[in-house]
Every structure is written in C-alpha cells, then in structure tokens.
C-alpha cells in the first residue's frame, strides 16, 4: 500500500495545507472510522458532529468548515471530488499478465493484442478484435463481430453477444449482457412475429456499466452510449436508445426502446422512461419517477407519491379515487352560483 505525506498530497492536488505536513497517510476512510494514519473528508455539513470526533490524521474540507477542525486539514473547493481523486492513489489493482489463458477459446479469425490479458474460460468469436492492454476476465463471452478498444476491462462473466463495439477504457462489471436481441414484436392474426434485431451496440470511451445490466442491440440502427456514461447495476437499456455523454443512471432503472437521453443527465434509482421520447441535456430525474413525456427544459423532475405512514396513505388513496367526482361537484356548484 502506498504512503503519502499531507504535504505531498497538498502539492499533487494543489490544495492549501493547515497543520502538520509530515503526517503519513496509509489509506482513506469515513470520518467515523478513520484512524490517525488515514485521510477522510467533509463534504456535507450534516456530518460536522463526526468531524469533531474524528481521529483521521488528515481531513479534506471546504474553507468554510476549517474552524470546526482541530487537526491537519487540506482545503479544497470541492472536498468530495478531491477525496475521490486522492482515493484513487490507494486503489491499487493487481497487474494482469499479458497473454491468453490455455483454457480460453479464441476463434482463428479473431485478433487479440499481444498486450491484452484473456482469462480462463473466455470465449472470443469470429472476426472480433481485442485491443492493447485490455483485460478480459474469467468466464467472459465475446461473440462474433465485436470490437474492444485499448485499455478496456470486462471484469468477469461479461457477455457481448454480437456486433458490440467498446471504446477506450470501458469497464464492465460481472453479469452484464450487451448486444442481446431487442424486444421487437409485430402482431399478425393473433400471433407475435419476431422482428430481427440487425443493429449493434456502441459504447463510447470511458464508460462504465454495472453488474447484471443489459443493453440490447438495435433493430436497424445501433444502441449508443456516448463517452463517459456511467450505468449502475441492474439497469435495462432497450434497443435503439441513445444515452448522451457524461450521463449517470442509477440501479434498477429501465429505459424503453428508442428513447433519447441528453448529456449530463442524472437518473435516480428505479426510474422508468417510456419509449420514443426525448430528454434534453442537464436533466435530473429523482428516484422512482416515471417519465411519460419528452422533457425539453433542463431541471429536476419527480413523480410518484412520497412516503407517509400507512394510515394517512390509505386515506389519501381513497380521496384520490374521488377526485374526479369532487371536481365535477365543484364545477356544478360554480355553474349554479353563476
């Protein structure tokens, strides 16, 4: 594990140091759990009490909070972002030896860079290409006509079914499936006819896709994630969707086919997005919301019923069913008075 002094961290990240610059930091932790050899941070005033009782050797915080700290501190404009950058210094991953594991299966027409790592029980299909310094983790399946650009990582048991293109430095977590058939059906004489899904999936540079998430290939056009999109676990992105750059989508969200999500959007957990609509740039959708119409104005949007005690909720539910009747009565009374 690397060790840094407070002074070294201040210089590396251009931070203002107050206190002992010679304190040696071995890792990072929360305010409540940090030891004198660890660094922590304060980004939310609600944790000021924890700051007062923290044993952390160094604390990253905003200039407005420096008077509340008694030990060594690093002043940052955005303590949360700064902490994230410092934490990466301690996130040391074991090196993977380049080469193809003897228990992997690679089609003769596929290309694997000599600097890539291909783990055990990996299968790579026809005409697929693995770029330089890629890591293809144990049990991953790469189908035909897939391309993985330099520096990307499939952690383990990732499936790229067919016609999937990954950009540079893409990271995909276990259980994710990309390039599955989109849910396309046409009804004829009381029976469903399956519509062939002839498109692909395109993932931009620096994207991350969480465990057990699914991104379906397009029917005709590709399903696209632009650069620096971050997808949490258990997210479903249907065929022909397009997700704009720098957008983040939290777990259990479902996006129906052909929806277009703008840049710098944030979708909370368990959001539902109806198909064939558009969400403009810089939109925040709070958790459990359902987006039924296109959004053309940036801002924060919510839907659903807030949590309350069960007794109150049941009363409100009964009154909700009576709203139409009550409105009609009010309109009738207004007409009588007029």
UniProtKB/Swiss-Prot annotation:
Residues of the signal peptide: none
Keyword Oxidoreductase carried by entry: no
The enzyme's E.C. designation: 2.3.1.191
Location of the active site: 239
Entry coiled-coil feature ranges: none
Known pathway: Bacterial outer membrane biogenesis; LPS lipid A biosynthesis
CDD domains found in the cross-reference section: LbH_LpxD
Keywords: Acyltransferase, Lipid A biosynthesis, Lipid biosynthesis, Lipid metabolism, Repeat, Transferase
Highest taxon of source: Bacteria
Keyword hit for Transferase: yes
Biological processes per GO annotation: lipid A biosynthetic process
Any one of the GO CC terms: membrane
An example Gene Ontology molecular-function term: N-acyltransferase activity
Catalytic activity: a UDP-3-O-[(3R)-3-hydroxyacyl]-alpha-D-glucosamine + a (3R)-hydroxyacyl-[ACP] = a UDP-2-N,3-O-bis[(3R)-3-hydroxyacyl]-alpha-D-glucosamine + holo-[ACP] + H(+)
Reported function: Catalyzes the N-acylation of UDP-3-O-acylglucosamine using 3-hydroxyacyl-ACP as the acyl donor. Is involved in the biosynthesis of lipid A, a phosphorylated glycolipid that anchors the lipopolysaccharide to the outer membrane of the cell.
Complexes and interactors: Homotrimer.
Family as reported in the entry's similarity comment: Belongs to the transferase hexapeptide repeat family. LpxD subfamily.
Protein name: UDP-3-O-acylglucosamine N-acyltransferase
Organism: Xylella fastidiosa (strain M12)
Gene designation: lpxD
